[in-house]
Amino acid sequence: MGMKGMKKNEENTGNPDFSAQLEQTANDYIFKKCLECGFDVEWREGFSVHLAACAELPTRFGTFVIAAFSEESNQKEHTAIVHGSVVGEQDCPLRVHSQCHTGDVFNSLRCDCRSQLEAALEYIASRPCGVVIYLKQEGRGIGLINKIRAYHLQDMGFDTVDANTCLGFPEDARDYRVASEIIQLLRIRSIALLTNNPRKIKGLKKEGITVTRRIPVLVGETSFNKKYIQTKRDRMGHLE
């Protein structure tokens, strides 16, 4: 029975059988989109994430499919923004983008995160296929509150590396296990990674992902983020 044919009325309101039927029908519709895209919707042994939902996502860069993934151990939710058919693709353009609440949402000028995200989406939309994986790894893995604490230290003269280490964190606390699992669930065979960060390439290769090449992400600097970008080059090995 379709969703339109399942109208709630006084008889079925609160009926557990009806509720279960409605939930199953909704799940069937949700996973139909995932299956149409060819993504892996099965639980994989040893994986920390699973594919939970897919839907179309129109943006100013073009129309994508947004795939949502749930990480069971900590309830984090990650997403993949997919353009075109990526199943079985080799040399698939892909960016792994760590969440930046201040930059991506509030358009902060302290970093170049939003500019890189938009550049990646624009690039991928111009190609036959591609993906942006958006990970809940705020502040290079230290979380939003600690990131804002690090901002305060930067206001006092610390650079982005020293601010993190003064708070007791490594300069970069991210890992790429979840990203590698998402790439496998999207059934991508190899990737061309959009990044200026060699550690991302190394991290993904360590998790078994084939990275065929690096695609530089070229964005402009501002007076606000110039020191931040230079520190990433000088102290974290970022490339241009």
Label the predicted regions.
Residues 2-240:
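Catalytic domains of riboflavin
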